Amino acid sequence: MSRIIMLIPTGTSVGLTSVSLGVIRAMERKGVRLSVFKPIAQPRAGGDAPDQTTTIVRANSTLPAAEPLKMSHVESLLSSNQKDVLMEEIIANYHANTKDAEVVLVEGLVPTRKHQFAQSLNYEIAKTLNAEIVFVMSQGTDTPEQLNERIELTRSSFGGAKNTNITGVIINKLNAPVDEQGRTRPDLSEIFDDSSKAQVIKIDPAKLQESSPLPVLGAVPWSFDLIATRAIDMARHLNATIINEGDIKTRRVKSVTFCARSIPHMLEHFRAGSLLVTSADRPDVLVAACLAAMNGVEIGALLLTGGYEMDARISKLCERAFATGLPVFMVNTNTWQTSLSLQSFNLEVPVDDHERIEKVQEYVANYVNAEWIESLTATSERSRRLSPPAFRYQLTELARKAGKRVVLPEGDEPRTVKAAAICAERGIATCVLLGNPDEINRVAASQGVELGAGIEIVDPEVVRESYVARLVELRKSKGMTEPVAREQLEDNVVLGTLMLEQDEVDGLVSGAVHTTANTIRPPLQLIKTAPGSSLVSSVFFMLLPEQVYVYGDCAINPDPTAEQLAEIAIQSADSAIAFGIEPRVAMLSYSTGTSGAGSDVEKVREATRLAQEKRPDLMIDGPLQYDAAVMADVAKSKAPNSPVAGRATVFIFPDLNTGNTTYKAVQRSADLISIGPMLQGMRKPVNDLSRGALVDDIVYTIALTAIQASQQQQ
């Protein structure tokens, strides 16, 4: 399983792209098999322009980098309260583009005035991907003490010390020149007097490492060389007219000089990397710059303001200087207006500046903690947690691969029809709708649903008679006759069950209008239990915000014996494994360990012993109270030696009353989604729906059924 590292910026202008590139290079140096994932595009120019980091990675490496979701699409989903849909799209995009990677580097959103939702969305994405969080921040005007306070404040907004996925922090632009607002202000221009020069607050990286509340995984000092931009980038920013191209694509601008004085007072600024800004009616400055160029000084560029046409005689005089590669370009604005435009120049790395990108990567990588990078590919002891969007995505993918047929006896029920259409569209399963074709098509049309490929409609009136003989044969020991069989086959659940029994379909889903008893009774009579199973039980998949839990049994067995409870535990653990959840089974009771007595506790204790004996490969412990099973701090005091306490993923309730009450209380109080009940122990998969099931509930139950069918047939 890939390690997922998410870089989350704490503010604007922290240099997120530079840090991402540096971490990528640090991983490349260690031979890490890496993939880069930007969930949501955030182009600086706004709109749906290409994302900066993703474009740079694609243009400058062979690393796989997924196409991010467009910001306009994300904003549309958020404005229509569809954050769950957004998270599912992100997890789908993640899985589609990060296969075979040892480490996936995820880049979060930068919080801006326009995107004030960035941090809350970053937190949701981190939870969805179960990512290890690394904050990226710049020093700004902070002293070491203030910086540590800001680190602690940032951690608290992401769950604080309880969030064990917070791995550390990377401090960028350490000891950079900043203004009073903490914005980086490199002194490119000589136009300002000393009173406006930026300040530098010195911090020792070694001392910062010692005092930081989080591990400092990188402390990157400010480097002026990294912002040296190409002359062509300046020309593009100003929308300038190029007079002489020269080396405009490779010359670097390291300072800006406004030539308002006489030549003798400006000669010291005629140096390599200078952008000389002068009015186009100052031929003396132009000629002086040309002389410097002919003497080997690689001036960054010459910028002419005012829009004056260059005298042809001057151009002729400067030909040899132009031939040295001196870039010259012109704007129509005056010098003052031009200076204002230059101050708004974006110092970010352009996507096509390969040389600068390489320099940034090498420089930043030198300051990323090498031990941390090495640890990313070491054997991880982090237990796997499956987030709800990841779980739902996994259901869809596994069902697609299974390619199964699922019969829906309530074929003309509106929610069922809609769910069948969704399953067909997503390729989850081929749904067989039982019902009158005209009525089913009418229901579909009334909902704007198109029933195309991937959906079959079977008219019970046409096929019912063909199943009479088989039903009589299966139930002849119970006195079944043909007239009674015909009467029972009027029930579409019975008809669908016989289709399943004869392998015409792979699974059955019902319950949107039928009771649980009506759904389960025919399969129990005709399909019966799987080999090795003495009972049928059920589980609910509880989709908590950060993790998926398995609850059993909350729907079938009123008061199981110790032996039955042990079997339910084993069935539930196997179901967890089948759906990608690492099973740590808590046998629940009202007391923990040996602290309680009584028949109820003894039943759970005996069930735990039996389950452990039957399946020593599974992690099973009990009796445990619910809080001891889920809360690490409670587990330390109540069950310090338990391998399950504080980290359980599968919860086995002692009876139906406790299980059903707890399931509904957790579901309602936490306002979370649950999927189920999924029946366990059947020879072939049959699943029951709640009569209040939503369309999505039906879709995921169909997916569960298809996956069960695939696993049972292996």
Swiss-Prot record:
Disulfide bonds: none annotated. In the N-terminal section; belongs to the CobB/CobQ family. GO terms for biological process: acetyl-CoA biosynthetic process. Signal peptide: none annotated. It catalyses: acetyl-CoA + phosphate = acetyl phosphate + CoA; propanoyl-CoA + phosphate = propanoyl phosphate + CoA. This is Phosphate acetyltransferase. Gene3D superfamilies: 3.40.50.10950, HprK N-terminal domain-like (3.40.1390.20), Isocitrate/Isopropylmalate dehydrogenase-like (3.40.50.10750), P-loop containing nucleotide triphosphate hydrolases (3.40.50.300). The N-terminal region seems to be important for proper quaternary structure. The C-terminal region contains the substrate-binding site. Residues 390-714 are annotated as: Phosphate acetyltransferase. Allosterically inhibited by NADH. One of its GO terms (cellular component) is cytoplasm. Changing residue 252 to H: Increases speed of forward and back reactions by 2-3 fold. Not inhibited by NADH. Homohexamer. The lineage of its organism: Bacteria, Pseudomonadati, Pseudomonadota, Gammaproteobacteria, Enterobacterales. It is an enzyme of class 2 (transferase). Its EC number is 2.3.1.222, 2.3.1.8.
